[in-house]
């Protein structure tokens, strides 16, 4: 099934799931995750973490890059949080005060994103909505790469209806 690109609000999507990209280290939501958490407070993958310092969580409370968190939502589409970047911000902008050496380059983030897509396919969704330029705003990714990965993933899973929302 071909990817559909629509002008519209991702939070009003009629897909079974919507996907947002999240980082593993932050304590607070930013960008789209902040908008989602404001609308649906129970959908905040940062709220369960333990603070290390400032906006940094402890190593023990961080999700693994390439993993997802699934939030069921009675008030809208279910939300998939794709942990496709380790450190918040653009690659190389911050140094982890916990001293971890987990790769967080643009290349590593793109690989984490593709790992998340593989995990999402395992959910056997009927339809998935993505924000236009996922991974490319605050995270600094390249849309041509990310769109290419979504296109390839969609072609490999024709049973999944994929919609990209230009917010």
Predicted regions and their residues:
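Macrodomain-like recognition of ADP-ribose-binding/processing modules
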Residues: 1-167
């Amino acid at each position: 099934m071909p990817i559909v690109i629509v002008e519209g609000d991702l939070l009003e999507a009629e897909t079974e799931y919507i996907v947002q990209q999240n980082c593993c280290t932050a304590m607070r939501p930013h960008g789209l995750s902040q908008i989602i958490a404001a609308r649906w407070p129970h959908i905040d993958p940062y709220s369960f973490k333990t603070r290390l310092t400032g906006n940094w969580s402890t190593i023990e409370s961080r999700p693994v890059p390439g993993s997802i968190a699934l939030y069921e939502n009675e008030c809208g589409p279910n939300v998939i949080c794709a942990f496709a970047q380790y450190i918040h911000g653009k690659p190389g902008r911050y140094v982890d005060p916990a001293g971890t050496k987990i790769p967080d380059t643009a290349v590593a983030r793109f690989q984490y994103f593709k790992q998340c897509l593989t995990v999402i396919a395992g959910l056997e969704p009927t339809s998935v909505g993505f924000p236009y330029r996922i991974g490319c705003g605050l995270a600094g990714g390249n849309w041509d790469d990310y769109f290419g990965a979504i296109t390839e993933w969609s072609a490999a899973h024709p049973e999944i209806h994929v919609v990209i929302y230009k917010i």
